[in-house]
Amino acid sequence: MYSAATVANAFIRIAKKNGLALSNLKLQKLVYFAHGWCLAILGKPLIKECVEAWLYGPVVPDLYHALKRYGSGVVTEEIPDVPEIPENSGAYPFLNAVFNKYGMYTPAQLVAITHQPGAPWQNVCPRSVIPDELIAEYFKNLPEKLKGSANAGK
């Protein structure tokens, strides 16, 4: 299990390699999707922190506060003083698969995905924790899967 900041930093590095920039909102969604797919495919959480239901979808509060200085703009630097996920670790192919699936969407499109009928965000009270069990069940029932990532991270 990693901190959400560690996973966000990995996504920042992946985005830079692909010539893309990420906002706080987009990072929140990528971390959430990675966590959800990890729960569904590997049966274990990716991040240590709880995910909460906020206005624009699932949010990891500590990650939000670490990046809020960027507002809706581009996150230009990695979050300091957090451990890295080594690029040769089993987690990196998994994170790359999540990025390849969701990284090209706009923040608004990612919010729309998290707000779809039956999504965990809709099934809890605002500003409350979204239980990992609810997230896992939702991602297990999605028709699409992350190709080639079922064994990643094992």
Indicate where each model-derived feature is located.
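Domain-edge interaction signal
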Residues: 1-154
